[in-house]
């Protein structure tokens, strides 16, 4: 059978664009369909704009810290619209780069919503296209929990990036990385910030020592924590404020209430069920190690598969798909030991197993932990601690987990990730000369395991 394309990709986010470009580079005829803006979640409404706001929010603390070093820095106010305009200009620039990457690779960009009409057919409005293979890369979308009034009066991360005005009082509902990052952002811009979550500690899935220290750090920055609570309802007041009820009986009045309790695969209305794909419990597309669905001609990468919802993972999966299917170089992406970071203030980073996970997998482990004042804080007067932790499989001496809370955690952890992927032992860490004075040198100078 003759097809219009060798590959149709639905979704021009990070994973879809990488798969499109590499496939075209291998000689495939490729079209990518996008209903919004090329760049997807990360570039348009996720990692990039969020980190730009995080950078902006950090200056208030920097100004406060400067006093200990002899600087008298007055923070008289902040021009929120100017920041949003600057952020939008950068997103426009990045979107243009994504469009150019597709054009230069020979990929046809089709704007509209793609609907899978058959194992080899995608409809975009009145246009019907055929391809030997279809790749779904539509990402994820914020979920809003079923709380009376929350959907009507609340916002998600999508809207939080484009608020017309900086809120003076905000409540963030959730305790995952998105929730704590936005709580840090709003707090840094001077908003009275409440963080409400069901568990005892934020950041479920991270190492417990990091979770405990993060709660201390968030509270130390002035964020008001409400652990063990859920929302019971949100009502709008005549003055435009929102009254938010908590399960402990508290009522909090805020300018904005943000739902950040998780994201779900963006599969609704794609026509997947009609072609024989049974979605998972979260709406995800189940795929094998080669990103192939139960329909042989349909593949999926990125957040839509609910494997590891991180942009670099989607990019790696898209690249591996293209090399395997069109490049004659079959390979798979391993989802173990993926470094990650949480861009709170202070930031958090992790790679490998948590202490509990390591004990479950290896049995006997040695844990090395250091909690100290960063050098800058000794003069700034900030009481915030830096926490570093290594987890070692006792039998092999391999370092199987590394965790950090403190300045530059993400930058430091990227290098530690290479060591763990390479199978470095604790002896290798011990034999490495540290760079002094840095916080990072602590990872190669911890000698005594925790009893």
Each predicted region: which residue ranges?
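Glycine-rich flavin
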Residues: 2-5, 21-28, 33-166, 199-203, ...
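Glycine-rich Rossmann-fold phosphate-binding loop(s) that bind the pyrophosphate
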Residues: 11-14, 35-36, 173-176, 206, ...
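Short hydrophobic core segments
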Residues: 8-10, 114, 129-139, 172-173, ...
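Glycine-rich dinucleotide-binding loop and its adjacent helix/turn
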Residues: 47, 138-198, 224, 273-275, ...
